[in-house]
Amino acid sequence: NNSVQIEVPQGEYTFRVWCDYVEEGSDSDKYYNTSDFSEIILADRENHSGSNDFRDAFRGSVKATVSAIKNEATVQMRRPMGKFKFISTDLEVFVADAVRKMSDKNQAFDKLLQSINFNDYYVVFRYAAFMPCSFNMFTDKPADSWTNMSFRSMMTIGGENLTTMGFDYIFVNGKETTLSIMLEVYDKDGEKISSTNPINVPIVRSKMTVVKGKFLTSMAS
């Protein structure tokens, strides 16, 4: 919760509010350019910041009458975007393949897992067609899209040997949109070791879509 005091002449108003993350102690834009409420746009097209929870943002509006006495208005903030996350279910197969040249292949899975440096691998997400890049506060809809977009992500190992490959926040037109997304995995030498065909991912405003599959060992046809 946050309160802001402003002075405006008496009258009827619509107050529109945008909220996102910036550097501590700064009021300068970081992830979004917010100078124009008809097109709040991602700040960096060349180095898209995916797999970053600081990309989360909220918007809201309220109509209010301002009179001569003290007035208060409460704005209900909601996300203008949805989130997707890719989780791979084939970690054991991936680990077995990664250590196939080891002399002792009969080690317990936990020991094999410890022998692999997952920082030696990275994931690339590619948007096959387009990616919404800006949002119109007045229409409550995305304003524009970019093509040929991608971002790089690191893998994280979770419970039950599930591997989070990456995630992103996407502006949503209305309640739901669908994007075509491809995923690729590379080793430290830049060699592609797995890839997928385009996957149609439904993205719902203010919700997270989880996509599960064998992304560590698949190869696009």
What are the language-model segments listed below?
Residues 1-83, 87-93:
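Short, low-hydrophobicity acidic/polar segments
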Residues 203-221:
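Hydrophobic, glycine-enriched assembly/anchoring segments
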